[in-house]
Amino acid sequence: AAGVTFEQLNGFLTKTTTSKAHVNPVIFRVMPNTAIEVKSSMTFISAYNASQEQIDLLISIFNELGNAILIEERLMEAGTALASSGIAFALRYIRAAIEGGVELGFYPKQAQEIVVHTVKGAIDLLLENKSNPEAEIDKVTTPGGITIKGLNEMELSGFTSAVIRGLKASR
């Protein structure tokens, strides 16, 4: 359950059983996102009383369904905002870009195909080049060019702060 801590889970488990096996139970908190449906989830795992072997096994299972990382429990809610709510935030950008494409003259299906493949290309650049977004942005941004004009307009409208505020509100 979202927001339920190891301390709460451990307290519940130790109260509801008299078995000595549950005195120090192994507990995992796991938070995938909806992309697990297509084996592309970003999954967060936190462990309590688990051995490294148990942790490695769980990570390997969830890596079959996308990408899984071990995080401290204190980051679980932040991870949920970043990766789970993040799916909706990314889709909201995609929807806005599609609407912009239609305003530019493309049919909706064409605009969606263009935007989806453009976003996939951006993701592939980051993953394959092991680079950061700013480095990839710099490759396409020229002085006085259309890209910098568009980026500046997005920032004037509060794009970056809107994303950050949305993430913080989702914790």
Predicted regions and their residues:
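Active-site capping/gating segments
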Residues: 29-44
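Hydrophobic packing residues within well-ordered alpha-helices of enzyme cores
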Residues: 9-13, 150
